[in-house]
Regions:
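A short, flexible loop at the N-terminus of ABC-type nucleotide-binding domains that lies
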Residues: 1-4, 9-26, 32, 74-75, ...
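The feature captures the beta-strand-to-loop junction immediately N-terminal to the Walker
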Residues: 39-41
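Helix-to-loop junction immediately C-terminal to a conserved catalytic motif
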Residues: 54
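Conserved ABC transporter NBD signature motif
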Residues: 62-72, 78
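Conserved ABC ATPase "signature" region
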Residues: 112-130
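Conserved ABC ATPase signature
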Residues: 134-138, 142
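Hydrophobic anchor residue at the start of the ABC signature
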Residues: 148
Length: 153
């Protein structure tokens, strides 16, 4: 379950004379343990909301919790519970090949186990043949699948 309690998110002015932008005000929201979709127009705040869920952005006031874990107090734990894929997966794929990206995502495992587990995950998802290809040689859909595998790892 994800809960937002009295959440405000205010972006301070960028330039002198600008006003602060209020993005969220007094938001109270509870999402139960189901898969959800966040939809809306470009620039409507979907990514900002998701970043609040996994601690990539902190609210100006209020609390965000995931399965009872406060995002501000336990960011590492929350990031293990909440993941999302960017529209452009290149924004989150940091390494040169899928196997390297997935190995990086498995940092919670002992170092000796990571590469083998990464290959296993790719194989289980029908992506094993892409393991050592350049990220830039993959199609957009293949990049999305690799990004999803990294998030689920």
């Amino acid at each position: 379950m994800i809960e937002l309690t009295d959440v405000d998110l205010v972006i301070p002015p960028i330039r002198k004379g600008d006003e602060a932008r209020v993005l969220l005000k007094e938001i109270n929201l509870t999402l139960t343990e189901r898969r959800i979709a966040v939809i809306g127009a470009n620039g409507s705040g979907k990514s900002t909301l998701l970043r609040l869920f996994n601690g990539m952005r902190q609210p100006t006031s209020g609390t965000v919790s995931v399965k009872g874990h406060d995002v501000a107090e336990e960011p590492r734990k929350v990031r293990q519970l909440v993941g999302f894929i960017f529209t452009d997966p290149l924004a989150q794929l940091l390494m040169s090949t899928p196997i390297e990206d997935l190995t990086l995502s498995l940092g919670h495992l002992p170092r000796k186990e990571r590469a083998g587990r990464a290959q296993q995950i790719l194989d289980e998802r029908g992506l094993g043949h892409l393991a050592h290809q350049s990220i830039y040689d993959l199609s957009g859909g293949e990049r999305q699948l690799v990004a999803l595998a990294c998030v689920l790892a």
